[in-house]
């Protein structure tokens, strides 16, 4: 589990604040600590990073955001949220100024970085990149890339997770295409002028990008989704001078942000068991970003001036609470069956070296170390292992450390099991012998099922041929009856009726058998699928993620 990364960005004073003649209330003490001094409060807040007013867009990107792109290519989901009061610099941080490279925001910089990495990738990797763009305005979801953009709804299922039904998705092949789409969507976003901000965003905007990469040699597929969120700013109606429609917008914005705050409170307070994700569209869409499968960065944007001291303190407290959220990010990866088998063999071989090293370090009787570490075709003896690898104590310790690190996220249960057995070879042999026996039994059942399926298909073919023959004979007899006017001959009519009755009975019996065969066939196909799935899952780690390679990274 990883915590949400929270960075604090303090913007320079703006013209309004300078005209009011206020003073600074917030001061960076170092790269991670900020001090705030107001008439009601004095204290420090610690974040992952604090950026002072002179920090550039590139400073923010290099420290806070670039690693999110790298994680995306490893198969992780990522989220970047900009939070703060109206006019605090959220949209500038996320979008920047168009056609100004130095002042480009985090979103266009990430798009450039993504396609740079694609260009630098091996030729054996294929990519698909698709984007979508939406806003949440007055608690309604609008598609910023489609004219028919109203009344989109949020749905959730086990396969896709949370998604917006009907949201337009566009495939892109370059940063130019992606930036054009981004700028088009930005032009459709709801804004209004207030006393606090001449271009105040009246909606939450969410730019979604998905990268799917496939290794054409191994068949492995990884996918990562990136949510780039520019939240509407909380605002004091008294300061912003909001009236009419702008006032109604402010109410909806504040209510939505209040729900976001309650979600964060619930995630960080062990006494609160219910997390109110469903209380707003924003929190439903960001469910995985807050406490779920995502590596999330929150950028809190602050005004330094005393005029906004209350709002700045509220923002700092929001960021401080968010730091306590634990996300459960996992690699979204699918390996081919051959690759899973290969990695399982590598894992077993490396783990056996750890077993050998532990025995040698514990001064066990070397002459008695001839028992198999693994049963079956992968069996190794400790004596052979020691001879072949010529392990020294330092190498053993380093090998042990490598195994621990390589399996840190994905095989914790297996490593814990080994520790519980104190590298007891009998226990390990028994566990793997049982696993291999079960696999052999499943293979036998699968072979038997395939044979039964083949027999059923043959029987079904024979039954179909018999049915065609019966229908053909029935038609011939019917034609003879009509052509010869045999209805006037009572004896023949009775005989024909008996034949028809027999044919109908046989036809009904056939249909009943056909129905039974169909049901049996469907059941067997279902069993076959379950067995294949069980065989594959038997070679996967229990937590459902992919085993890391012992040599050569993931």
UniProtKB/Swiss-Prot annotation:
Residues 3-325 form the Kinesin motor domain. It comes from Schizosaccharomyces pombe (strain 972 / ATCC 24843). Transmembrane segments: none annotated. One of its GO terms (cellular component) is microtubule. InterPro entries: Kinesin-like_fam, Kinesin_motor_CS, Kinesin_motor_dom, Kinesin_motor_dom_sf, P-loop_NTPase. ATP binds at residues 84-91, 233-240. This is Kinesin-like protein 3. Keywords: ATP-binding, Coiled coil, Cytoplasm, Cytoskeleton, Microtubule, Motor protein, Nucleotide-binding. The lineage of its organism: Eukaryota, Fungi, Dikarya, Ascomycota, Taphrinomycotina. SUPFAM superfamilies: P-loop containing nucleoside triphosphate hydrolases. Residues 446-473 form a coiled coil. The keyword Transmembrane helix does not apply. GO terms for biological process: cytoskeleton-dependent intracellular transport; establishment or maintenance of cell polarity; exocytosis; intracellular protein transport; microtubule-based movement; retrograde transport, vesicle recycling within Golgi; transport along microtubule. Belongs to the TRAFAC class myosin-kinesin ATPase superfamily. Kinesin family. GO terms for molecular function: ATP binding; ATP hydrolysis activity; microtubule binding; plus-end-directed microtubule motor activity. It is found in: Cytoplasm, Cytoskeleton.
């Amino acid at each position: 589990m990883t915590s949400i990364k929270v960075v604090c960005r303090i913007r320079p004073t703006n013209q309004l604040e300078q005209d009011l003649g206020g003073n600074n209330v917030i001061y960076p003490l170092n790269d991670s600590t900020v001090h705030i001094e107001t008439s009601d409060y004095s204290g420090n807040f610690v974040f992952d990073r604090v950026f002072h007013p002179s920090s550039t867009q590139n400073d923010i990107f290099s420290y806070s955001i670039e690693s999110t792109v790298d994680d995306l290519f490893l198969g992780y989901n990522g989220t970047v949220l900009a939070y703060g009061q109206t006019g605090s610099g959220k949209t500038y941080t996320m979008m920047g100024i168009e056609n100004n490279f130095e002042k480009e925001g985090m979103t266009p910089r990430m798009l450039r970085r993504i396609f740079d990495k694609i260009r630098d990738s091996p030729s054996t990797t294929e990519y698909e990149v698709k984007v979508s763009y939406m806003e949440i305005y007055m608690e309604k979801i609008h598609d910023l890339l489609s004219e028919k953009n109203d009344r989109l709804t949020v749905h959730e299922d086990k396969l896709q997770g949370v998604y917006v039904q009907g949201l337009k998705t566009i495939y892109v092949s370059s940063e130019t295409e992606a930036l054009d789409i981004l700028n088009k969507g930005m032009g459709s976003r709801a804004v209004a002028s207030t006393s606090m901000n001449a271009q105040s965003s009246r909606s939450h905007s969410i730019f979604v990008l998905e990268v799917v990469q496939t290794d054409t040699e191994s068949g492995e597929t990884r996918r990562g989704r990136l949510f780039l969120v520019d939240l509407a700013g909380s605002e004091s109606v008294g300061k912003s001078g909001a009236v009419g429609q702008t006032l109604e917008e402010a109410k909806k914005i504040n209510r939505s942000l209040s729900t976001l705050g309650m979600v964060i409170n619930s995630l960080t307070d062990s006494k609160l068991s219910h997390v109110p994700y469903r209380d707003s569209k924003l929190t439903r869409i960001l469910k995985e970003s807050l406490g779920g499968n995502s590596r999330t960065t929150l950028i809190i944007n602050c005004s330094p001036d005393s005029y906004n001291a209350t709002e700045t303190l509220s923002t700092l407290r929001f960021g401080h609470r968010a730091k306590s959220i634990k996300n459960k990010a996992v690699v979204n990866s699918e390996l081919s069956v051959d690759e899973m088998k290969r990695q399982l063999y590598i894992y077993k071989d490396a783990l056996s070296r750890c077993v050998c090293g532990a025995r040698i370090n514990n001064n066990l009787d070397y002459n008695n170390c001839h028992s198999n570490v693994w049963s079956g075709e992968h069996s190794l003896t400790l004596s052979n292992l020691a001879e072949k690898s010529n392990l020294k104590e330092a190498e053993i310790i380093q090998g042990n450390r490598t195994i621990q690190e390589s399996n840190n996220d994905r095989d914790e249960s297996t490593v814990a099991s080994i520790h519980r057995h104190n590298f007891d070879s009998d226990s390990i042999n028994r566990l793997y012998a049982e696993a291999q026996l079960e696999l052999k039994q499943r293979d036998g059942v699968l072979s038997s099922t395939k044979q039964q399926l083949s027999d059923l298909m043959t029987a079904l073919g024979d039954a179909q041929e018999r049915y065609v023959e019966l229908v053909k004979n029935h038609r011939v007899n019917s034609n003879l009856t009509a052509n010869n006017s045999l209805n006037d001959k009572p004896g023949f009519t009775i005989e024909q009726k008996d034949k028809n009755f027999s044919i109908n009975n046989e036809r009904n019996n056939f249909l009943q058998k056909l129905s039974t065969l169909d049901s049996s066939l469907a059941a067997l196909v279902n069993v076959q699928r379950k067995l294949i799935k069980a065989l594959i899952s038997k070679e996967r780690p229990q937590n459902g993620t992919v085993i890391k390679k012992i040599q050569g990274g993931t």
